[in-house]
């Protein structure tokens, strides 16, 4: 089956535009995508980068550079995640604290998170999996109670809507997306 039949011509035209104008990085096409994606997600800014790992590394790096987090601080993260989520944390000298998933959704178990919070905890990284939103109001309440940053890994959940209408990538303090097809 021709999987490109529906959008093949449009994709070829877009690729041709990028290749023929010589701007493979940054440039007008990238700026337009960042603007359009920000509108789609409902955020002020989008920054294009190479991949989801880089996006997450840059988020944690920014918080370290700004002094919001420092090496040795902890980030609660679901045990059921792709390794990039963990690598982004450790790359910045932060310590991942694994939280077991809910057995019925395989997403971070919001009933276990608060028991993992310590004086060194600075953030919760949620991973929206299988097109489902991992965020719950309980997670938001925990972040508020302990003044924690909420980081979203949205590699598997572009455009999912929370019951309050917010879209994945606009729920937390920062979010990383990936367009890798695997």
Regions found by a protein language model. Give the residues of each.
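Structural detector of well-ordered beta-strand residues that form the stable sheet scaffold
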Residues: 47, 76, 97, 150-151, ...
């Amino acid at each position: 089956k021709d999987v490109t039949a529906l959008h093949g011509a449009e994709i070829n035209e877009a690729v041709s535009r990028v290749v023929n104008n010589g701007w493979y990085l940054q440039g007008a096409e990238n700026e337009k995508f960042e603007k359009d994606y920000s509108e789609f997600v409902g955020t002020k800014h989008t920054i294009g980068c190479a991949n989801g790992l880089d996006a997450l590394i840059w988020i944690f790096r920014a918080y370290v550079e700004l002094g919001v987090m420092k090496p040795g601080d902890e980030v609660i993260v679901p045990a059921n995640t792709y390794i990039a989520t963990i690598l982004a944390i450790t790359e910045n000298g932060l310590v991942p604290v694994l939280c077991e998933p809910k057995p019925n959704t395989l997403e971070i178990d919001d009933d276990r998170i608060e028991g993992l919070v310590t004086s060194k905890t600075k953030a919760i990284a949620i991973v929206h999996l299988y097109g489902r939103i991992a965020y719950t109001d309980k997670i938001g309440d925990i972040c508020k109670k302990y003044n924690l940053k909420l980081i979203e890994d949205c590699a598997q959940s572009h455009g999912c809507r929370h019951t309050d209408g917010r879209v994945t990538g606009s729920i937390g303090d920062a979010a990383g997306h990936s367009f890798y097809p695997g």
